[in-house]
């Protein structure tokens, strides 16, 4: 909330008028008309006085256009006779366009509420008084051009790119109001109208420029709506980067490609205790082509300054006119450098040497397997310092020589593919190997090479070992060296090369020593009775001396060379050095990788059978989705059948670069949860055996206990009911009581007596007694028929507590465990 101003005061200029009651309507009587003739006479007298008292303006004589045309025709033949042509007349300077209504309104408000921010006397931006706060863009360097505001302690917010502080009390009347209401339409700022639409502020391209950072945007009531930070060119219009307010919330609107609009502060460099803008070096030395050695000295003196690369670019571009940018500009820095000879451990014949193609550094940080190799020769530059893609230059003794780029090669265990070259750097894709060799063939068909021990094993992108990028597949994040020769943040150090001894420059001629320079600068020193040394560019003869008494070395301080640890330094120059940018930056990109063919899947009991068809070595991995993943993986190179067990928690299988496959077991059992009691017990027993046995046992115990109690109570009641009748001799029990208590109403005869009685009295009933065994047989058969059902119901008592091996089935449906599927 510190960056939200509050309106604790009111500005007089933009306050609405106070409300007043409407005046009552009064009837005004018409005035009496004056006499018409008197009024006309007074008007006539005043008009005559004006005409007589006003001075008559002097009329300029009217020019005769015809005479003017005739004079021009007469002068035309006279001008043709003159041999010298008159220079064309300069066009009169166009008058500055007057500011419009919106500009005038903003300027009137800005006179009090904005202040310039200056750095070393130059305006870099503005600070604005809004509400009760002073707001200034954080990227604008300098101090506010006001003694009171410059003393304030500002709070900085990098999120909103803003700095703010409380306004001094005596300046609150100069501040502007602010508002968070922003209906779509047109607003005002210093350069005219600002359109607000779709949550963006836009202006016509060219209306804003660097130096406008911090200017406010006003609505038609003079309230601040936003503060400008920068802009992004979008063709006909420019989108503004602003800080605004949305109901007590600070919001920063930054369009894509927005640039800060603070005025650029020139970076200063040093030359002979004199400072100058790095982008505008002084005339001596001002150009590398005119004063190469002095220019390199100036660059070495400013190598640690922030504007070094501006000075380098300005020194190498001698033309004062603006030049069109091209790819050749990136090679321009190499005209101040040269290739060199460096030590190589293996020059191709099993011995070391000073090779023109020595390996300095091999980088393999890219995850796509690309190598970035730095060598001592330079590719893409000719010996005349011109850019040529088809050439490379190398150091042949002391002189750079040209060779064709087509003869350049890189190899490990097999030849590599060169994907990019520039300067000292080569990009290559190489197969697996233990050594790296770089070489070339010169114009004399002589091969030069250098071999270094280097273990190279290209990393695998994704989960498949493919050999070439597919046209279709899957994109995975990776890193590579971008094939761009533009300047990057990486840099290498360069220095003046040391003097190179060369004994071939000395020759003996009848007691004298002749030094042949061969168009070079040679430093010599001879000890022939006295000290004889110097620096020469032409041939020289040393009298009365021998070759063994002289030393000659080629010196060249007009070019830099790479600061290699394999080359000795120039002891006279100490630690003086320069810097140049290098190409091919490492960047995060996406790589296209293939996707393996989907496997053929067969579902079984608690398992999945997968038939795999790899086109190249493909990784198969699987894990459990429980607490213990038990991760397993293997590379599959040929057709293979894999059987995987599906645990209860689920199984995740990943084949190649495809999305993971997920499987879950489907629980099922015999019986049904909504059937007969024995089916219900069987269903739950197979799913939850322990709990089912406990529940059935407790229920059976309770049921048997209740049945036993009921039988006991019935027996007690029966005994109480029949006891009185048993104690009474010859008592007759009532029929209802005998029916309930299952007792005879009276003492009955024995079976023999009853049978005699039936035989004598009711013979049909006597013979019906023979059907009793038949009825018993029928009842027994029915009981035997229902016995299997009873046994199946009670079978759970003899089963183990583990689940049925057939109770689990596997199902899958779009890797969704909640989605239903048919049991397999």
Curated annotation (Swiss-Prot):
Disulfide bonds join 113-128. Residues 36-68 are annotated as: Host transcription inhibition. Pfam families: Alpha_E1_glycop, Alpha_E2_glycop, Alpha_E3_glycop, Peptidase_S3. Residues 1-104 are annotated as: Disordered. Residues 1-10 have a biased composition (Polar residues). Residues 91-100, 99-113 are annotated as: Ribosome-binding. SUPFAM superfamilies: Trypsin-like serine proteases. Residues 60-72, 86-101 have a biased composition (Basic residues). It catalyses: Autocatalytic release of the core protein from the N-terminus of the togavirus structural polyprotein by hydrolysis of a -Trp-|-Ser- bond. Residues 262-274 are annotated as: Functions as an uncleaved signal peptide for the precursor of protein E3/E2. GO terms for cellular component: host cell cytoplasm; host cell nucleus; host cell plasma membrane; membrane; T=4 icosahedral viral capsid; virion membrane. A motif (Nuclear localization signal) lies at residues 61-99. Structural polyprotein: As soon as the capsid protein has been autocleaved, an internal uncleaved signal peptide directs the remaining polyprotein to the endoplasmic reticulum. Belongs to the alphavirus frameshifted structural polyprotein family. This is Frameshifted structural polyprotein.
